[in-house]
From Swiss-Prot:
Its EC number is 2.1.1.33. It catalyses: guanosine(46) in tRNA + S-adenosyl-L-methionine = N(7)-methylguanosine(46) in tRNA + S-adenosyl-L-homocysteine. S-adenosyl-L-methionine binds at E45, E70, D97, D119. Catalyzes the formation of N(7)-methylguanine at position 46 (m7G46) in tRNA. This is tRNA (guanine-N(7)-)-methyltransferase.
């Protein structure tokens, strides 16, 4: 079910100081005003939804800073209210469109990017809007440190096939796949499942018996 638009969401976000980044320049120029320990590794989730994944990650991994990026104010309000139930020094959220992500973060500043259940944009003419399209991956590559990773999870068979075969395996000089599964929850006792933190969509899809696909990959450097 699509979340009903909250017309007051933008004003709510502007009034919040805990967890919400209202001055985007801080992420490039003064991380000490965003995180208590600004020198920790930084992981970002693009399209964080209602926040289940990123809040739980921040709770379980205090040695990592987490930034959730979500372009819909109504949705980020839900995530923010979940975060307020906890006292976290390593979590921040911002309402922002990933199309302009290079304006938000410094190059070579991110250790890991999470893409969870992104919009599949099924029509061919919309392929450039997919977050695993080379258009976006080039932006993400600029943000990631040399050993940085991308983790992508989806229930969508077509989007996963596109990501693997049309993008990652289509240019082996650019990408290296580190982990790949078409059925994450079938990997009993596998570390990838044991450490998995589900999103709100993921929980629903698993209950419906849908297979969760996952791939982790990195960008190859010229000397690799």
């Amino acid at each position: 079910m699509r979340l009903r638009n909250n017309a007051n969401a933008p004003l709510y976000l502007k009034s919040q100081e805990q967890y919400i980044v209202n001055d985007q320049q801080l992420l490039k120029n003064d991380l000490a005003k965003v995180f208590k320990n600004p020198h920790l590794p930084l992981h970002i989730e693009i399209g964080m939804g209602k926040g289940d994944f990123i809040v739980e990650n921040a709770l379980h991994n205090p040695q990592i800073n987490y930034l959730g990026i979500e372009k819909f104010p109504t949705v980020i309000v839900k995530a923010h209210k979940k975060a307020l139930k906890h006292k976290l020094d390593n979590l921040a959220m911002i309402c922002f469109d990933a199309n302009a992500i290079l304006d938000l973060l410094n190059s070579k500043s991110i250790d890991k990017i999470y893409l969870n259940f992104s919009d599949p944009w099924p029509k061919k003419r919309h392929a450039k809007k997919r977050l695993t399209n080379p258009y976006f991956l080039e932006k993400f590559a600029a943000l990631l440190k040399d050993d940085g990773l991308i983790e992508f999870k989806t229930d969508n068979e077509s989007l996963f096939h596109y990501t693997i075969y049309d993008v990652l395996l289509n240019d082996l000089t650019k990408y290296e796949i580190l982990f790949l599964t078409y059925n994450l929850y079938a990997l009993v006792n596998n570390v990838e499942l044991l450490k998995n933190i589900p999103t709100e969509y993921e929980k629903k899809f698993v209950m419906q018996g849908q297979r969760i696909k996952k791939v982790s990959f990195r960008f190859l450097k010229k000397n690799d």
